[in-house]
Amino acid sequence: MESMFSSPAEAALQREAGMPGLLTPLPDLDRVYELERVAGFVRDLGCERVALQFPDQLLGDAVAVAARLEETTGSKMFILGDTAYGSCCVDVLGAEQAGAQAVIHFGPACLSPPARPLPVTFVLCRRSVALELCVKAFEAQNPDPKAPVVLLSEPACAHALEALATLLRPRYLDLLVSSPAFPLPVGSLSPEPKPLERFGRRFPLAPGRRLEEYGAFYVGGSKASPDPDLDPDLSRLLLGWAPGQPFSSCCPDTGKTQDEGARAGRLRARRRYLVERARDARVVGLLVGTLGVAQHREALAHLRNLTQAAGKRSYVLALGRPTPAKLANFPEVDVFVLLACPLGALAPQLSGSFFQPILAPCELEAACNPAWPPPGLAPHLTHYADLLPGSPFHVPLPPSESELWETPDVSLITGDLRPPPAWKSSNDHGSLALTPRPQLELAESSPAASFLSSRSWQGLEPRLGQTPVTEAVSGRRGIAIAYEDEGSG
């Protein structure tokens, strides 16, 4: 299940060495990778060094695309083909190390704004869509021509939504077309009126309309995962969509449709269980999963305030890629919260190889903030920026004297009554002075020290003062297969 965060470690060992072959025929490169638009982007900026970020599955075309762009723009192209948490986020750090003045991101993207103001453009690598088959599938799933429906798609199929809507509008009166929410260029003005942005998409809602009034028709399907429940783009849509509205998906190649109601129910049940685990937890580990997405520092501070307000202890862990072996070194942590981009925030299933569950920031918000979710909002947002002040979905913590904190709460897992959180001042460092001793020593009680003393193994024993002091002597010389003090036989 760790593959949810990045490519499995075994993939590097199983991959055959050598230059990968060309995946896209040369005549189709311009169309698939939108090279004319990309070349115009580079020329308009006047960049001399540009970073081209490719996912693993598209590296076979990287050399041909870079050569074509160098020929048409005269700029130097650098290929970025390795990222720590998959390739959906813009690798700003890698681009800066190459001295690039702009980044061109190819392939699936979470469309999260980068943490640093570097010019970025996205190429979603268009996937062919059988429009006639999709029209028949839409008509079969939506017999009522007056029902409000939103057209959604995976990023690679977004180019075909307007054409699909053109074929459907003569019959369907209330049709809304979504579009990818590309980050606005630095210094540009927001359009007026500003469309609603949710799930990495923009929705041009009419005045007085709400997204919760619409059903959904999704065109696309993940080719990377054999389990559709682990498709992060579709999963975040199913989790955040209004539970009472229909949601169906359609394969862009065959037109095969599926009602996603049952899958959405399974996903919501799984996430509600994780929220209950977070409410029962006393120690929370905050995993820093991204440094290249905007507002990650503010989100980390927000999560720490949440845990403190709920009477929980939190630890910030920067471990690189989360793996079961790394997280097993922290048995005192009850749950982990992964601070990552919207696609990486969906944690793997609890039945996987991780010893403790891994949550999304929204699930910690639901567990620690008694005022969450706001009325009329589906209780799951995958982007941590939606939880911060300034977002229309931000819900401030109730004051300490609010009755919301005193509401009786029973754990649905253990059946025990949860005590209300004990409020502490911000100057409290987690230890409580008990009694001053006559020798002017101070006895303290620390939860961390109490847990350490109860562990059967507490680490390497220093044994200070119990081992004799010896003089330094010469060690072995040579290499492991032939030390000088060993025979040559």
UniProtKB/Swiss-Prot annotation:
The modification Phosphoserine is found at S7, S446, S456, S488. Keywords: Acetylation, Iron, Iron-sulfur, Metal-binding, Phosphoprotein. InterPro entries: DHP2 (IPR010014), DPH1/DPH2 (IPR016435), DPH1/DPH2_1 (IPR042263), DPH1/DPH2_3 (IPR042265). The modification N-acetylmethionine is found at M1. Binds 1 [4Fe-4S] cluster per subunit. The cluster facilitates the reduction of the catalytic iron-sulfur cluster in the DPH1 subunit. GO terms for molecular function: 2-(3-amino-3-carboxypropyl)histidine synthase activity; 4 iron, 4 sulfur cluster binding; metal ion binding. The keyword Ubl conjugation does not apply. The keyword Acetylation applies. One of its GO terms (cellular component) is 2-(3-amino-3-carboxypropyl)histidine synthase complex. Its cofactor is [4Fe-4S] cluster. The modification Phosphothreonine is found at T435, T467. [4Fe-4S] cluster binds at C89, C110, C341. GO terms for biological process: protein histidyl modification to diphthamide. Pathway: Protein modification; peptidyl-diphthamide biosynthesis. Gene3D superfamilies: Diphthamide synthesis DPH1/DPH2 domain 1, Diphthamide synthesis DPH1/DPH2 domain 3. PANTHER family: 2-(3-AMINO-3-CARBOXYPROPYL)HISTIDINE SYNTHASE SUBUNIT 2, DIPHTHAMIDE BIOSYNTHESIS PROTEIN. Required for the first step of diphthamide biosynthesis, a post-translational modification of histidine which occurs in elongation factor 2. DPH1 and DPH2 transfer a 3-amino-3-carboxypropyl (ACP) group from S-adenosyl-L-methionine (SAM) to a histidine residue, the reaction is assisted by a reduction system comprising DPH3 and a NADH-dependent reductase. Facilitates the reduction of the catalytic iron-sulfur cluster found in the DPH1 subunit. Component of the 2-(3-amino-3-carboxypropyl)histidine synthase complex composed of DPH1, DPH2, DPH3 and a NADH-dependent reductase. Interacts with DPH1. Belongs to the DPH1/DPH2 family. DPH2 subfamily. This is 2-(3-amino-3-carboxypropyl)histidine synthase subunit 2. It comes from Pongo abelii (Sumatran orangutan). The gene is DPH2.
